[in-house]
Design a protein with these regions (language model features):
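Compact, charge-rich alpha-helical regulatory domains located at protein termini
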Residues: 2-108
Length: 108
């Protein structure tokens, strides 16, 4: 069963529907840049689950050595799109609607 986790950026919140497969996905599967990948590894993160379970906000990534704004943007964007691509096609539209509502872009 999926577990819903909300992670916020500076001004945008994202929902992650975590399942066992996504939790155990290695960052190598996301095609991150060498800088972003190395920064996460040095901080002790090797899987999506390890990262999502230990941060409340993407801005926390900036505290990691060599993980500046560009890396934070890349990591957060790739996580969002990777998770989205793993959803079944029938769940994708509802997911986007839920994210828009969470951010106040769509009425409840």
């Amino acid at each position: 069963e999926d577990i819903q986790t909300v992670v916020k950026g500076k001004s945008f919140k994202v929902i992650f529907y975590m399942n066992e497969a996504l939790l155990s996905t290695d960052f190598a599967d996301m095609d991150l840049s060498v800088r972003s990948s190395n920064a996460l590894k040095r901080a002790g993160y090797h899987t999506i689950g390890e990262l999502i379970e230990n941060i409340e906000s993407f801005s926390e990534l900036e505290k990691i050595k060599n993980c500046g704004k560009t890396s934070v943007y890349e990591i957060s964007g790739r996580l969002f799109f990777y998770q989205y691509s793993q959803l079944s096609k029938d769940k994708r539209q509802q997911y986007l609607m839920d994210v828009l509502k969470l951010n106040g872009i769509m009425p409840e």
